[in-house]
Amino acid sequence: MKRESGNRRIGLKFCLLGMIFSTGIALSASHYTDLRRSEPIHGDPAAGAAKAVVCFACHGAGGNSIAPNFPRLAGQRPDYLYHRLRSFKSASASDPYYSKSPMTALAAPLTDGAMRDLAAFFSSQPPTAAAATHAGPEVEKGSELFHAGDAARGIPPCQGCHGADANGSSTRTGQYRAYPSLRGQYAAYVVGRLTSFRDGRPHNTTNDMIMGGVAHSLDDASIQAIAAWLNSLAPAQAF
């Protein structure tokens, strides 16, 4: 019975992804960077270290942010970091979301090589543990949603793309390399990102498009619970 239930949840996930890719991308391909066949990102961590000093003001030394509204970058997957930087760099000045982000102006002058070096540097940095701010039933509910989803509400399990340990998929191919590790990330940042996906704010990659479909059925309580569970985990080691 347990395996049958698990198969239904996995089936829900792939059904959802199939619908997204068979409709949205076909209709809006020009608006999205297709990561499904993306090549691995390589850069020079030493060169990235020199470029990263300006990033420390918000993201902390080595990418270990001390402010919960700024994401922790240390130990993050390089492919994810690179494609996020590309999204900021390519954003339109008239975009109501990206035009308000300080990252848009900071990324604008970066060359492709610089973005690769920055991604390589931050991914190589050892993450420090952030103080968990949640515990109890909310964390347990977040773990349940992350691992099992909620078929009745059309929510697939997050682990299908982000891995059972929230450290990213072990597949490490194509789009899966660009899914971020979420372990130990600040709850406030995760809440902001999931809310943004749910509310249909700007998405720039096919992975973003998937997240828009996944987050569509999440209510505020579910978002808070998932963020609380992720925040309770020890961060992953550097890549």
Where are these regions (language model features)?
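Short glycine/threonine-rich turn/loop motifs
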Residues: 89, 143, 147, 168-174
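The canonical Cys-X-X-Cys-His
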Residues: 55-62, 118, 155-166, 226, ...
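The feature marks the first
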Residues: 32-91, 188
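Sequence context surrounding c-type heme c attachment/ligation sites in exported
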Residues: 46-56, 74, 78, 147-159, ...
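Axial heme c-ligation environment in periplasmic c-type cytochrome domains
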Residues: 66-74, 88-126, 130-132, 174-181, ...
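Electrostatic cytochrome c docking/interface patches
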Residues: 28-52, 66-67, 124-154, 235-239
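N-terminal export/targeting leaders of redox proteins
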Residues: 1-43, 86, 231-239
